[in-house]
Each structure stands twice: as C-alpha cells, then as structure tokens.
C-alpha cells in the first residue's frame, strides 16, 4: 500500500508540474498586470508573492533544519498531494457526471432551505433556458477561454469608483468552477482557486459540459438548484418546455436567487427578464450560440 502511494505521488507530482506550468503560461499570456487599473488586487498579489518568497527562502536556508518544521512540512506535503489528487480525479469525473453534492447545496441544507434538485441531461434542457442564461450571464461564452478580460477591466474600474456597489465579471465557466469545486463568498484565496479551476475545466471539458453542469447546479431560488427543479417549482413544467419569457425570468434571478424571486415575481426579475428576452432575440442569429444550444 505504501509503495502504491509513493508511485501515485510521483505520477501526480509530474502531473502537477505540467498542470501548473500550463496554468502559469496561460495566465502570463492572458493577463498583463499593467493592463489593469491600480487596485487593491495588485497590492494583494504583490503581498502574497512577497510572503511566499520570504517563507520559501527562510525554509530553505533556516527553518528546514528544525525538526518541528521538518515534520510540519512533511504533513503539509501529504495534505497537499491528497487535496490535489482528489480535486484532479473530481475534475476528470466531472467530464461524465454531475457532482453528487456541492458545498453550496450542503450549505442550503444546513441553513434550513432544503435541497430541491433534479439533474437532467443536456438534451432534456431545451434551447430556451440555455439561450436565456447565455444572454443573461455570458454572451461571449461560446467563444472565450473562460475569462472575459474586457469585462474584468470594466468591473475593476467601476468597483474602484463605487466601492459600495460591487460589480462582478464572472463568466459561466467561472461560476461553474465556484459552484462545483468551491464555495460562495469572496476572498483572495477563493478567487485564486476559482481562476485555477476555471482554467482547468476550460482545458478538459467541452462547452456543452460546462453549460450542462451550470444549468444543473446553479441555485435558482432558496434551496432550488438546477433548471429542472426551477421549472417544476415556478411553472409546473419540464425545463425543455419553458417559453422564452419563463426561461428569462429564471435567468434573471441568478445574480442573487434568494433576493430576486421568480414566484412571487420581484420587480427586479420582471424588469430584467424583459431585457433578457430582447438579448435572446439578438443572439438568435449568432451561429456559435445556436450551435451550442441545439
């Protein structure tokens, strides 16, 4: 057993090296820090880099000579390998299967909202809800590689000018990374992991798979997860039978499904769903979008 574990660690060590180099090359090519406005993000990145560098140098020249630090380093390496191997296997299984449960779904149960979901296949979802979500959340989804750099720049500039009104720029791929692998909320660490998992699913999953996972695990009301559960709860029909207006109402609640309700219809959802329908008509002539939703 110990020998098998050592072999497994060696294999995944090289998988990790290739994975992280691939990721770093992507980040360097995709994002130029100088392209972004001066924000707290830059400061945090520099602080993290400086801390990692200092700790690494201290460990290499001093700390690794201390027995306690040696033992702690061994334990941390084991924990890291277990976490990386588990997440990699989970990532690969995600190509074929919907997640058995997500942290957000578990949190819904503990908060007393329950868990109402009904995973369905991509073909059973119908085109209207797919189009509504793309129109609402990420109109460049068929074409980008997981990130919309222009939207990120705009959001950073807006958030700098309006610190009390935070605007997001997450793509559908980023939301899938958060919903399937991580947890809700902010924080520099979670956002960094979100970037890593977004990069990973874009490299390994197809766009259809990413959209299917999103439409099955996204929260669409308090304790309601996925389009089938939402369609049944709000309109007493299957997801594939939703009209454009009904699909738009479900998509309109996605920014904050506990606050923006479909039933009863909140003012926000009523207003935003009309705009989503108009965007759906605009996307009707986009061949990439149409190829994806059919």
What kind of region is each of these model predictions?
Residues 2-294:
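Juxtamembrane regions of bacterial inner-membrane/periplasmic proteins
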């Amino acid at each position: 057993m110990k020998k098998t574990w050592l072999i497994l660690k060696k294999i995944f060590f090289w998988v990790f090296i290739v994975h992280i180099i691939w990721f770093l090359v992507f980040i360097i090519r995709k994002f130029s820090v100088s392209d972004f406005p001066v924000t707290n993000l830059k400061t945090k990145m520099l602080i993290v880099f400086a801390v990692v560098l200092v700790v690494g140098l201290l460990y290499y020249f001093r700390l690794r000579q201390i027995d306690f630090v040696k033992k702690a380093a061994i334990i941390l390496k084991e924990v890291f390998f277990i976490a990386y191997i588990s997440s990699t296997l989970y990532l690969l299984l995600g190509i074929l299967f919907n997640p058995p449960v997500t942290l957000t779904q578990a949190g819904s149960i503990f908060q007393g909202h329950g868990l109402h979901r009904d995973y369905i296949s991509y073909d059973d979802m119908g085109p209207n809800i797919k189009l509504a979500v793309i129109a609402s959340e990420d109109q460049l989804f068929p074409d980008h590689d997981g990130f919309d750099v222009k939207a990120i720049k705009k959001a950073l500039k807006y958030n700098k000018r309006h610190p009390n009104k935070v605007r997001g720029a997450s793509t559908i791929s980023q939301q899938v990374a958060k919903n399937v692998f991580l947890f809700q909320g902010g924080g520099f660490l979670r956002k960094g992991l979100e970037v890593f998992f977004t990069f990973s699913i874009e490299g390994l999953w197809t766009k259809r798979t990413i959209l299917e996972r999103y439409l099955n695990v996204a929260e669409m009301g308090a304790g309601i997860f996925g389009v089938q559960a939402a369609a049944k709860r709000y309109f007493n029909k299957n997801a594939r039978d939703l009209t454009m207006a009904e699909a738009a109402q479900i998509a309109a609640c996605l920014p904050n499904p506990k606050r923006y309700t479909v039933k009863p219809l909140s003012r926000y959802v009523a207003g935003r769903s009309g705009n989503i329908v108009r965007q759906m008509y605009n996307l009707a002539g986009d061949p990439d979008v149409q190829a994806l939703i059919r």
